[in-house]
């Protein structure tokens, strides 16, 4: 079990690391701007990782996600909306913890929003490639062998850690659990991609409007403390409750 998991994660880390280093060296020599190099590195490394996973799973007689799983049935608008709102509620619940992190971590997120290709990468490219990789390959492969809880947990933790930024790690792991539930429940990458894209679009728009990822709901409602605590308490209860329901549903599929 652990050999498979470590091999899959190592493939991702090594390929992304080596390809990114190669692109920055080649791009720098060719005089390419940093935004373009970052975009090519991100897209190229994920495409190579996906290809490597297909080869590895075929060798191990696994069943990687096929393109036909992009569109499947059993997907209701209510479930997609609930999943998106759960991510928002969990994000609000984690704000006090996230706000304690150094400003430099917020600056790196702001830089992504200001990137020339920021909107394209965040709202379109990232949801497609990341869901195809983490849910469609890593989660599905592990679920087929070890069950839904192992598949979702490992894929979610890896999904969070691969972001690198402590802020994104804290928020991406629970987000990954929600997205893992969506994929497991619907067997549709399209559903997971949609929720991921909706969340990224919401976050991108909020940061663009507010001017910084470091501005919290608490900051915005500084003069309306009662309203803030009502929203915050509700978000904690709804987010934790929804996440618990999703986890219990996943456990039933073990």
Where are these regions (language model features)?
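N-terminal, membrane-interfacial amphipathic/helix-forming hydrophobic leader that caps
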Residues: 1-69, 76, 201-254
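Alpha-helical transmembrane segments of MFS and MFS-like solute carriers/permeases
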Residues: 7, 11, 82-86, 121-122, ...
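Alpha-helical transmembrane segments of multi-pass membrane transport proteins
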Residues: 11, 15, 86, 147-150, ...
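Alpha-helical membrane-inserting segments
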Residues: 15-27, 48, 52-56, 89-101, ...
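Juxtamembrane helix-loop-helix connectors linking adjacent transmembrane helices
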Residues: 26-39, 62-132, 139-140, 144
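Transmembrane helix-loop-helix hairpins at the membrane interface
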Residues: 116-254
């Amino acid at each position: 079990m652990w050999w498979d998991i470590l091999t899959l994660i190592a493939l991702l880390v090594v390929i992304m690391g080596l390809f990114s280093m190669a692109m920055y060296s080649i791009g720098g020599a060719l005089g390419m701007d940093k935004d373009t190099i970052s975009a090519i590195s991100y897209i190229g490394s994920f495409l190579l990782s996906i290809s490597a996973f297909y080869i590895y799973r075929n060798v191990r007689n696994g069943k990687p996600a096929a393109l036909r799983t992009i569109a499947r049935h059993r997907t209701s608008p209510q479930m997609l909306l609930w999943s998106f709102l759960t991510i928002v509620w969990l994000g609000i619940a984690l704000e006090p913890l996230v706000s304690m992190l150094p400003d430099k971590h917020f600056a790196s997120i702001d830089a992504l929003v200001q990137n020339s290709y920021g909107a394209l990468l965040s709202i379109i490219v990232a949801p497609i490639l990341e869901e195809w990789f983490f849910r469609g390959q890593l989660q599905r492969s592990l679920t087929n062998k070890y069950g839904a809880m192992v598949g979702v947990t490992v894929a979610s933790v890896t999904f969070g850690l691969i972001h690198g930024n402590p802020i994104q790690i804290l928020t991406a792991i629970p987000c990954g659990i929600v997205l893992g539930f969506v994929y497991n429940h619907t067997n549709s990458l399209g559903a997971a991609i949609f929720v991921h894209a909706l969340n990224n679009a919401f976050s991108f728009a909020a940061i663009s409007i507010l001017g910084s990822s470091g501005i919290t709901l608490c900051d915005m409602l500084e003069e309306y403390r009662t309203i803030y605590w009502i929203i915050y308490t509700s978000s904690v209860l709804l987010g934790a409750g929804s996440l618990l329901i999703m986890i219990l549903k996943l456990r039933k599929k073990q």
